[in-house]
Amino acid sequence: MATYHHWTVGQALALFDKPLLELLFEAQQVHRQHFDPRQVQVSTLLSIKTGACPEDCKYCPQSSRYKTGLESERLMQVEQVLESAKKAKAAGSTRFCMGAAWKNPHERDMPYLVKMVEGVKALGMETCMTLGSLSKQQAHRLADAGLDYYNHNLDTSPEFYGSIITTRSYQERLDTLNEVRDAGIKVCSGGIVGLGETVRDRAGLLVQLANLPKPPESVPINMLVKVKGTPLENNAEVDAFEFIRTIAVARIMMPSSYVRLSAGREQMNEQTQAMCFMAGANSIFYGCKLLTTPNPDEDNDLQLFRKLGLNPQQTATSHGDREQQQALTEQLLHGDTAQFYNAAV
């Protein structure tokens, strides 16, 4: 059985304090011990239920408490979701992520969610969902349907968390991660840089993630996307080097996890993204929208991968992230593609 290092905040801060190039060198060494440095795993994302969320997350345009101009939508029909999944698969995707703006799914919605998972699995794709908090029974129902991954972010450190969210406790988030893991579903959990947190808070977040009974298989690191109408719309810009440091420290602390560039890539130039890959990021969401925030369009992603000589991974459903298939690689290296996913606006 694999053993994991138990990290302290002091140890994490010591990594953040290293000279940047020294930190990048260490992170790249760790990365090469566990992954092929030329491979980037690619996921697609669809918002299956948008807006009208009762939570008060200060960064989120989907909260019903803020006037952001986002139009709410009911849970999509199963057939609509499967049609989007088919289009994503035709474009080369092998993992389909479905997100719903809920505090938690209602029991009346569970049969539809189960059908979505079963339908996407029947297409030969990996499945991922982010639906808010889950009960033990809900986690097991989704696991029985074939759900591969569940995303539930911790967002920030326990100490800073109450400044950003009051409608869901930190412990609730940890409890959901435990239920997901106990049900046999792989865990996807990360956080956001740019909420107004300190470097100690970033260190605290990564310590929480790394010290879980088993670190998450995927760790999304988001850069705050400031949305007009949310309480954080006037937050200071995130320094690119500070974001890159966070990626590098995450790679060192969770050497076997996929570190994903998620929201905020639209704000990054090619050089920043390239340094994130050098720092150990090896997963992205691909296409024009990430739920309700901008994401670089697919043509820009294709061009960047070709410039950097990166082969995005296409994963085989039965073997997880590490299995390679050729279709997406060929698309990314040799030509443009149609829109990769249709995340809701």
UniProtKB/Swiss-Prot annotation:
Keywords, in A-Z order: 2Fe-2S, 4Fe-4S, Biotin biosynthesis, Iron, Iron-sulfur, Metal-binding, S-adenosyl-L-methionine, Transferase
The gene coding this protein: bioB
Keyword flag Oxidoreductase: no
Matching NCBIfam families: bioB
Family affiliation: Belongs to the radical SAM superfamily. Biotin synthase family.
Protein name in UniProt: Biotin synthase
Pfam families xrefs: BATS, Radical_SAM
Cofactor, free-text remark: Binds 1 [4Fe-4S] cluster. The cluster is coordinated with 3 cysteines and an exchangeable S-adenosyl-L-methionine.
EC number: 2.8.1.6
Lineage: Bacteria, Pseudomonadati, Pseudomonadota, Gammaproteobacteria, Enterobacterales
Biochemical pathway: Cofactor biosynthesis; biotin biosynthesis; biotin from 7,8-diaminononanoate: step 2/2
